[in-house]
């Protein structure tokens, strides 16, 4: 796997870690002890929503976000793979 730097901008401050391109960002964050919101873990709700500030993610597995949300940079971290070094604002459920 290729590893990318993921920086999460959370209400508790910045969290940065290396994430392989074949592990969902939410799963990887949890493994290293970063507590992020989630509910279904299936890409079909908005509990884990975040917004990409820079970089690229593959969020094509999600079934909740519409094209407008995705065009605006919103992702579901439970079903998002890093495709580059990426910065994501977390806790965006209210916005989607």
From Swiss-Prot:
Function: Ferredoxins are iron-sulfur proteins that transfer electrons in a wide variety of metabolic reactions.
Cofactor: [2Fe-2S] cluster
Organism: Panax ginseng (Korean ginseng)
PROSITE patterns (alphabetical): 2FE2S_FER_1, 2FE2S_FER_2
Disulphide-bridged cysteine pairs: none
GO BP: any one term: ferredoxin metabolic process
SUPFAM superfamilies found in the cross-reference section: 2Fe-2S ferredoxin-like (SSF54292)
Coiled-coil regions, chain positions: none
Protein name, as recorded: Ferredoxin
Matching PANTHER family: FERREDOXIN, FERREDOXIN-2, CHLOROPLASTIC
2Fe-2S ferredoxin-type domain boundaries: 4-94
């Amino acid at each position: 796997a290729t590893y990318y730097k993921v920086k999460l901008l959370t209400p508790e401050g910045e969290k940065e870690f290396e994430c392989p391109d074949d592990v969902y960002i939410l799963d990887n964050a949890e493994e290293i002890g970063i507590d992020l919101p989630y509910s279904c873990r299936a890409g079909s709700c908005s509990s884990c929503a975040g917004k990409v500030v820079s970089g690229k993610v593959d969020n094509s597995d999600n079934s909740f976000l519409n094209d407008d949300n995705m065009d605006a940079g919103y992702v579901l971290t439970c079903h998002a793979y890093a495709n580059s070094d990426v910065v994501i604002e977390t806790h965006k459920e209210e916005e989607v």
